[in-house]
Amino acid sequence: YKQCHKKGGHCFPKEKICIPPSSDLGKMDCRWKWKCCKKGSG
């Protein structure tokens, strides 16, 4: 269990999720995902 802290409604740490492109011409689709905190809890 990692300790998480809130900042401006977002939670840290966050991890980068990368999805391979659907075509060879595309770039890797990378986006940040908030890893720890869940909305609506506590």
Swiss-Prot record:
Subcellular location: Secreted
Alphabetical UniProt keywords: Antimicrobial, Disulfide bond, Ion channel impairing toxin, Myotoxin, Neurotoxin, Potassium channel impairing toxin, Secreted, Toxin, Voltage-gated potassium channel impairing toxin
Cysteine pairs bridged by disulfides in the record: 4-36, 11-30, 18-37
Domain of life: Eukaryota
Tissue: Expressed by the venom gland.
Keyword Disulfide bond: yes
Annotated SUPFAM superfamilies: Defensin-like
InterPro entries per the UniProt record, alphabetical: Myo_ane_neurotoxin_sf (IPR023355), Myotoxin (IPR000881)
Single GO term (MF): potassium channel regulator activity
Gene3D superfamilies recorded: Anthopleurin-A (2.20.20.10)
Effect of residue 25 to K: In 90% of fraction 2, 20% of fraction 3 and 78% of fraction 4
GO terms under cellular component: extracellular region
UniProt entry tagged with the keyword Hydrolase: no
GO biological process: envenomation resulting in occlusion of the pore of voltage-gated potassium channel in another organism
Family note: Belongs to the crotamine-myotoxin family.
Function of the molecule: Cationic peptide that possesses multiple functions. It acts as a cell-penetrating peptide (CPP), and as a potent voltage-gated potassium channel (Kv) inhibitor. It exhibits antimicrobial activities, hind limb paralysis, and severe muscle necrosis by a non-enzymatic mechanism. It also binds to sarcoplasmic reticulum calcium-ATPase.
Self-association state and partner proteins as the record states: Monomer.
Protein name, UniProt field: Myotoxin-A
